[in-house]
From Swiss-Prot:
Protein name: Transcription activator of gluconeogenesis BDCG_02812
Localization per record: Nucleus
Top-rank taxon: Eukaryota
Annotated spans, Disordered: 1-70, 135-163, 202-239, 285-344, 401-421, 559-590, 655-732
One example GO MF annotation: RNA polymerase II transcription regulatory region sequence-specific DNA binding
Entry keyword Transcription regulation: yes
GO cellular component, one term: nucleus
Bias (Low complexity): 227-238, 560-572, 672-719
Keyword annotations: Activator, DNA-binding, Gluconeogenesis, Metal-binding, Nucleus, Transcription, Transcription regulation, Zinc
Record carries keyword Oxidoreductase: no
Compositional bias ranges of the Polar residues kind: 25-61, 202-226, 291-322, 333-344, 401-416, 573-586, 720-729
Naturally occurring in which organism (per UniProt): Ajellomyces dermatitidis (strain ER-3 / ATCC MYA-2586)
InterPro entries on file: ERT1_acuK_gluconeogen_tf (IPR050335), PAS_13 (IPR056751), Zn2-C6_fun-type_DNA-bd_sf (IPR036864), Zn2Cys6_DnaBD (IPR001138)
Length: 779
């Protein structure tokens, strides 16, 4: 049989291929023979594929080694695959053209591997691979591969439309335009997509990148037909249970996946912001995770399960902006500093059809702009701003809204976020942005811990008795060799770096102290206070400026029972060794200094030993000696007694108040307006009243402790006039409430009994850097 006869024959039978085809198959698959065998083979006729590709002069020498090798096709057509012949990449291929089968030439289907047995055929097409997302819509449109020529022709168009309607193509990812079909193909794909009963309209409310693309529904008349068709489809499937999480949520090739606005995320570096954005995307966009309020607290648009109708595309009656995704938070998402635009301009006109029909992956940006959840008034139209400029070509959108008629289909219930629409809820707005770079720029010299330990030693010798001083000295002496061993190799730069580490760690703890409602202080390893919370000041009466050494320390309360009497009458239990080395007041600035150096002296913060009574100080330094170079993660939980802040005037007023109370208890009354009820009485500046209020005298500015207003006023006056509480105060069943109640703690003997927990944090040189302490009063 000649080659011309074979080219004119109909489609070859798969059961009995011709002898020439078998010969061609053997010629294309059998390796080259020895030279003597090749001379015998050259006399035979060449195969069909060789005769179609090579001219007649070279067809007689099919096994010539100098003949250029044919390039293998990526996938053979259906006819060549059945005939086991070599095909080309072009469609239709040359063999089908010569045989008159160009209309039925399409890619053949290979046998799938075992691990791809459950994968649909459309996902295995060339160029698709991992970009297949909507299996439910494509399994119904698998082409009939064994049909006749007319069915194959129609299925070819349907397959091309479906594959392009369900996958991301590389061209779409680069050009941000995923709707790239021609007009002839759009007429075929839209009825098939609209009439498919498995179409899920609720996925159109899923999140999408709100800061990447722009769209306008009016520029393309075909999208208007899409909107009208969508309204009919939504009304027919609104009663069915919808699954908005059918499509994949992660596509690494999507251009908007890593489109994070780094400047608005309050991160100091790009890598931390990208990591946070990716974690937020994975957490809020998970396929099996239902929508929640947490998904919108960082600026992401959460999923909703509402029904997709044409009303989401058209303008409302009050000229309000349409909401494509049905999320009420999208209405208030108004980044500061951006121009106002309409939500319908978020995507471009071609991307809308891609979002609607192609089931793109649900990738979106996290915190793409500073958050502002302020709710607009009922008379204002909701507005939203985007990061893309306003397209002036979309200005005629309002003139074409008559083609989009809203339907009366009731939307399904969705989770709203009314808590976010509160005027006082500004995530990240109230927080003052601080940069730690100022710490590294401001620290120029190391901190003098030597002067701090000298001042601590002088204070301990001045306040404590020799026996108690010896106990504290033994505890500090036990860790002195460890301090020497860790610091002897440090130079000037290391000490400066150590101070920078301390200031940087303290910078982090300031936010913790402000956010925590527990009385907290942070001090150095010398015991000098470095940071304090306002709750601690309320509890003890120590002002923050006094504790940090910015104001003079006039406290005379040392916890001794004779401290107040000694300050008034001038008596003391023992003579201190050095009275002029600590807390000397600078005559020019009025600030406490070290060493009495005047204006050139170093300001001295308050030591931790000044805030505790004698027994608590000894117990603290014994525990500190065990924990300083011991367990780096260890902590101590015990009880202590905090000393209230008292000046000489406070102690004198309290001492005279006790004498008047004793006289009033003997005489029954006094000329200064003192009344008693049993043995409990309180003293004010102009008069006194009983604590229970039963026999209260109305002389002067007497207050009733049971009255909240009077309690607040008494606390305010006590802050200015000193402690005014009797030594025996009883509390009711309600206990202590508010600042006033905390101020009244410890007026009996100037001590507040507390339970406290503290730990030691070390620096990079494994040296104790700071001590963090939390207190809770025992009521």
């Amino acid at each position: 049989m000649t080659a011309s006869t074979r080219n004119g024959s109909p489609s070859p039978s798969p059961a009995a291929p011709t002898a020439t085809e078998q010969e061609s198959k053997s010629m294309t698959t059998t390796p080259a023979n020895p030279p003597e065998t090749k001379s015998q083979t050259n006399g035979k006729g060449s195969g069909t594929a060789q005769s179609s590709q090579k001219p007649a002069s070279t067809s007689a020498n099919a096994k010539d080694p100098l003949r250029p090798r044919r390039k293998k096709a990526k996938r053979a057509c259906f006819a060549c695959q059945r005939a086991h012949l070599t095909c080309g990449d072009e469609r239709p291929c040359q063999r089908c053209i010569k045989r008159g089968l160009q209309d039925a030439c399409h890619d053949g289907v290979r046998k799938k591997a075992k691990y791809l047995h459950d994968a649909p055929n459309e996902a295995l097409l060339p160029g698709i691979r991992g970009n297949y997302y909507n299996q439910a819509n494509t399994t119904r449109n698998i082409p009939n591969q064994r049909g006749n020529a007319s069915n194959s022709n129609s299925n070819k168009v349907s397959r091309q439309s479906v594959s392009s309607a369900n996958f991301y193509t590389p061209q779409a990812a680069r050009s941000y335009n995923v709707y790239v079909q021609a007009k002839s193909q759009q007429s075929h794909v839209r009825p098939a997509v609209m009439q498919d009963a498995s179409m899920n309209p609720s996925v159109f409310h899923a999140q999408s990148p709100s800061s990447t693309q722009n769209f306008d529904l009016s520029s393309n008349p075909q999208t208007q037909n899409l909107s009208s068709a969508m309204s009919q489809t939504a009304s027919s499937v609104s009663g069915q249970n919808q699954d908005p999480f059918g499509a994949a949520f992660f596509d690494p090739s999507h251009p908007a996946l890593f489109n994070f606005d780094i400047a608005s995320m309050n991160f100091g570096n790009r890598y931390g912001a990208l990591e946070f954005g990716m974690l937020g995307h994975m957490a809020t966009g998970a396929g099996d995770t239902p929508p929640s309020d947490s998904a919108t607290q960082r600026g992401s648009i959460g999923r909703s399960s509402g029904t997709f109708t044409a009303q989401n595309f058209g303008d409302s009656a009050n000229n309000q902006s349409p909401f494509l995704f049905g999320d009420p938070v999208l209405n208030d998402w108004n980044p500061t500093g951006q121009g106002q635009a309409n939500p319908r301009n978020i995507y471009n006109q071609n991307a809308v059809a891609g979002q609607m029909g192609e089931q793109n992956p649900h990738a979106f940006a996290i915190e793409s702009a500073p958050m502002n959840f302020a709710s607009p008034s009922s008379t204002e139209s909701p507005q939203m701003t985007t990061t893309t400029p306003f397209d002036e070509a979309n200005a005629n959108f309002s003139s074409r809204t008559n083609l989009m008629h809203p339907t009366n289909t009731p939307q399904q219930s969705r989770i709203s976020t009314p808590g976010l629409k509160h005027q006082g809820l500004h995530v990240g707005v109230k927080r003052r942005y601080r940069s730690p770079s100022s710490i590294y720029e401001s620290v120029k010299e190391p901190y003098s811990y030597t002067s701090g330990f000298h001042s601590l030693t002088a204070f301990i010798q001045r306040r404590f008795s020799p026996q108690k001083t010896l106990q504290i000295a033994k505890a500090l002496a036990s860790i002195r060799p460890s301090f020497i061993a860790t610091t002897k190799t440090l130079n000037q730069d290391d000490l400066i770096f150590m101070e920078k580490c301390f200031q940087r760690t303290l910078w982090e703890y300031e936010d913790f102290i402000n956010a925590c409602g527990t009385p907290t202080i942070v001090c150095r390893r010398t015991g000098e206070i470095a940071a304090v919370g306002k709750e601690f000041s309320i509890l003890t009466g120590w002002k923050k400026e006094v504790l940090l050494g910015k104001e003079p320390n006039l406290n005379v309360n040392t916890g001794s029972s004779l401290s107040s009497a000694s300050s008034v009458r001038g008596s003391s239990t023992f003579t201190p060794r050095n009275n002029n080395t600590h807390n000397s007041i600078d005559p020019h600035t009025g600030m406490p200094t070290v060493g009495g150096g005047g204006a050139s002296g170093r300001t001295q913060p308050v030591f931790l030993a000044e805030l505790l009574d004698d027994d608590s100080v000894i117990e603290f330094y014994e525990d500190f000696a065990k924990l300083a170079f011991g367990d780096s993660r260890g902590s101590v939980m015990t009880t202590c007694k905090l000393l209230k802040y008292k000046t000489k005037e406070d102690s004198a007023a309290l001492f005279h108040g006790k004498e008047e109370t004793q006289q009033g208890g003997v005489d029954g009354s006094s000329g200064t307006g003192t009344t008693t009820s049993g043995d409990v009485a309180t003293t004010t500046a102009t008069g006194t009243s009983t604590s229970n209020g039963a026999n209260a005298n109305t002389n002067g500015n007497n207050t009733n402790p049971n009255d909240p207003s009077s309690a607040a006023s008494s606390s305010a006056s006590s802050a200015l006039q000193g402690p005014q509480q009797s030594p025996r105060q009883t509390w009711g069943k309600r206990g202590i409430a508010g600042e006033a109640g905390m101020n009244q703690l410890g007026f009996r003997d100037g001590k507040v009994e507390c339970s406290y927990c503290w730990t030691v944090k070390r620096d990079v040189f494994d040296i104790p850097m700071l001590i963090v302490m939390n207190f809770l009063p025992c009521i």
